[in-house]
């Protein structure tokens, strides 16, 4: 609403991110998650995780309190990237068996996983963004070296599009098919950040604490993301918020860890599994920003 004719006031969760804290959530049923599982979900009360080490096919869903086992992936694998919602998700690529890159893609309809068209480039430790089984982006990763490849999914096939400016794996990703962000990754210096506008990647301001193998919110845009945890030199609890132009340090995870997975938005996110660096834990933490009043001056 307008106040005084020139001031716009709004009430929402985005303004509450700087004061939000992480809280303990329900434990996974299956340990051994990460590095990089297929995650999906839009908030702290809506999460999904599939795959994990060693070559797991398990899939679990989160309702804000507890995790429940649902139908497995057709192909067990680790280092897989995924995106979407509890009723419409995608899992692609990965490592199965250890050291063998895969290009297979599976779609989740809310009940079952179905195999579909393969990636053009088999790889692992990539990132993905998107909100359904018909609209996703898959970028970065590792073959026999770190790669910059980016592929776009239209619901039936993958198409090679413009590459990242910096080849990397163990990368954080958030957003949609047309508005995404690629965060950090290996190799050093582990602080690169790029945004995607639907046709090309642009380098933007770096994260404050250089690291890789962290988790990220998955749902949002190139202007709204959360990145947490990671390493080296040791597993960290650092959490940073991206507002579209700069990174801000916010409250840390309760337990520092790397090789963890993330889902949700920058204002309502889940941090799942991970370890310092092993064994992989069953921990879940919830980041839920309080609704707060924000003020913007308009001319």
Could you tell me what each predicted segment is?
Residues 1-299:
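Polar, enzyme-active/binding microenvironments
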